[in-house]
């Protein structure tokens, strides 16, 4: 890691929190992909996939919640910049072998800073929404493995999580 990457950019010289000034950075295409999952009982996963939970269509509600969360990240994470997102999507993939529902969010913008936090927030809120809608039938659910998978654009360039 270079010395520049070892600095905590959200702290000033006195150690106080600050929002990073991105005013001099070029506007470039940015993209981030994040993933996470909700592990649950096999019966709960079946209820979700069959659309038979009492609270309604879990995946539709969680998808909208994740997209809304991406758009509101700057209100939730104190030092994040408000970004004009051009794309936000949330996808779900059942993994019966792990009794899990995989969540993937992709976020894009033309901007001066990345959209990693927006993608991570989308996954997190989608997972929490799934938990909320299913907790009456499964209190053992576990949210885990929320992580950045890839980012594209910006001064630091492209990055892909090693497999």
From Swiss-Prot:
InterPro entries: MoaC, MoaC_bact/euk, MoaC_sf, MoCo_biosynth_MoaA/MoaC, Mopterin_CF_biosynth-C_dom
Disulphide-bridged cysteine pairs: none
Binding site for substrate: 79-81, 117-118
GO molecular function terms noted in the UniProt entry: cyclic pyranopterin monophosphate synthase activity
EC number, UniProt record: 4.6.1.17
Pathway in which this enzyme or protein is active: Cofactor biosynthesis; molybdopterin biosynthesis
Enzyme active site: 132
Repressor found in the keyword field: no
Catalytic activity, as annotated: (8S)-3',8-cyclo-7,8-dihydroguanosine 5'-triphosphate = cyclic pyranopterin phosphate + diphosphate
This protein's UniProt keywords: Lyase, Molybdenum cofactor biosynthesis
Keyword Nuclease (UniProt): no
One of the GO biological process terms: Mo-molybdopterin cofactor biosynthetic process
HAMAP family tied to this protein: MoaC_B (MF_01224_B)
Subunit structure: Homohexamer; trimer of dimers.
Function summary: Catalyzes the conversion of (8S)-3',8-cyclo-7,8-dihydroguanosine 5'-triphosphate to cyclic pyranopterin monophosphate (cPMP).
NCBIfam families with a match to the protein in the record: moaC (TIGR00581), PRK09364.1 (NF006870)
Family note: Belongs to the MoaC family.
Name assigned to this protein: Cyclic pyranopterin monophosphate synthase
Organism (species): Chloroflexus aurantiacus (strain ATCC 29366 / DSM 635 / J-10-fl)
Gene: moaC
């Amino acid at each position: 890691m270079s010395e520049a990457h070892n600095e905590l950019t959200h702290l000033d010289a006195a150690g106080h929190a600050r929002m990073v000034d991105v005013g001099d950075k070029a506007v470039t295409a940015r993209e981030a992909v994040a993933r996470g999952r909700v592990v649950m009982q096999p019966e709960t996963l079946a209820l979700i996939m069959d659309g038979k939970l009492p609270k309604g269509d879990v995946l539709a509600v969680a998808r909208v919640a994740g997209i809304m969360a991406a758009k509101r990240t700057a209100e939730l994470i104190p030092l994040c910049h408000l970004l004009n997102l051009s794309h936000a999507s949330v996808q779900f993939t059942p993994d019966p072998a792990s009794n899990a529902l995989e969540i993937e969010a992709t976020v894009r913008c033309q901007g001066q800073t990345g959209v990693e936090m927006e993608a991570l927030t989308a996954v997190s809120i989608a997972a929490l929404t799934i938990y909320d809608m299913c907790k009456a039938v499964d209190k053992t659910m576990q949210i885990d493995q929320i992580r950045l998978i890839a980012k594209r654009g910006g001064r630091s360039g492209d990055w892909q999580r090693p497999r």
